[in-house]
């Protein structure tokens, strides 16, 4: 099917008026033009300040549950993009209690950390692996990636406000304007840093992120990860939320230490 280009009437009239003038001046030498370099986007202080306030809020939370409904694009060898959907639920109780459940189109995984033991559970296959481990939630997220090759979805939630996500890494920052996510009044921000464009919608009342869009600029097709977040910062979390108890048909396996680049536990 051929593609049709439809131009506004006003633009057609303008082109008709300009055409004779262009014909009359066709014999004149054309001045050599120099391409103008696109201006470098600025770092707006108000945008960086909003990110800083959000990071402080995240680091101040002592106990919370957050659910992210997400889509992730994967680029095939053909250059085509496939979109996968899923969700992840985090339950966190500072300083050292962690639970994550990942349920995507391709896999299910649960992660438990009770302050002394880290468990990875694959409910569909009924396999689980455990390792003794101590430290804070932030240390767990880092260890899971660096030692076992498990990169938690939305790991930035645990890194904002720490030296792993310094504000100095932001190369441009723009306040797009007000927006609403699931009826929550937000400020919409656009950021750029090396290899990544990302957008965040921050709730005006709670200062918590309500939506994230992350574009990978290292890939020419710029695949995106999109997540909408729902927060609960008031419901209490029990110790049992962070401890794994195997069922009769669950089987233990060993955790292999990382021998290859980390793969994100999609979504």
Tell me the role of every PLM-derived stretch.
Residues 28-30, 35-52, 56-59, 121-186, ...:
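Flexible, processing/modification-adjacent segments and terminal tails
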Residues 42-127:
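N-terminal mature ectodomain segment of secretory-pathway/periplasmic proteins
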Residues 77, 109-113, 122-123, 130-132, ...:
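A short, polar/proline- and glycine-enriched secondary-structure boundary/capping micro-motif
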Residues 42-45, 69, 104, 119-120, ...:
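Gly/Pro-enriched, hydrophobic low-complexity segments
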């Amino acid at each position: 099917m051929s593609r049709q280009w439809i131009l506004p009437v006003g633009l057609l009239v303008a082109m008709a008026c300009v055409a004779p003038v262009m014909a009359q001046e066709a014999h004149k030498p054309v001045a050599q033009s120099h391409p103008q370099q696109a201006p470098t986007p600025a770092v707006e202080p108000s945008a960086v300040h909003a990110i800083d306030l959000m990071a402080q809020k995240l680091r101040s939370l002592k106990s919370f549950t957050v659910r992210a409904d997400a889509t992730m694009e994967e680029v095939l060898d053909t250059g085509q993009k496939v979109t996968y959907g899923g969700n992840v639920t985090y339950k966190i109780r500072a300083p050292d209690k962690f639970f994550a459940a990942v349920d995507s189109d391709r896999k299910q995984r649960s992660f438990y950390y009770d302050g002394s033991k880290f468990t990875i559970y694959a409910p569909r296959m009924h396999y689980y692996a455990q390792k003794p481990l101590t430290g804070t939630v932030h240390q767990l997220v880092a260890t899971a990636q660096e030692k076992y090759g498990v990169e938690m979805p939305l790991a930035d939630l645990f890194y904002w406000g720490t030296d792993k996500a310094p504000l100095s890494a932001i190369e441009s920052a723009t306040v797009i304007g007000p927006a609403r996510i699931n009826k929550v009044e937000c400020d919409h921000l656009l950021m750029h840093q090396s290899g990544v464009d990302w957008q965040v919608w921050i709730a005006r009342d709670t200062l918590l992120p309500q939506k994230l869009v992350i574009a990978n600029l290292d890939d020419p097709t710029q695949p995106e990860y999109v997540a909408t977040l729902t927060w609960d910062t008031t419901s209490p979390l029990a110790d049992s939320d962070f401890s794994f108890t195997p069922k009769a048909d669950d089987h233990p396996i060993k955790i292999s230490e990382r021998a290859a680049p980390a793969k994100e536990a999609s979504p």
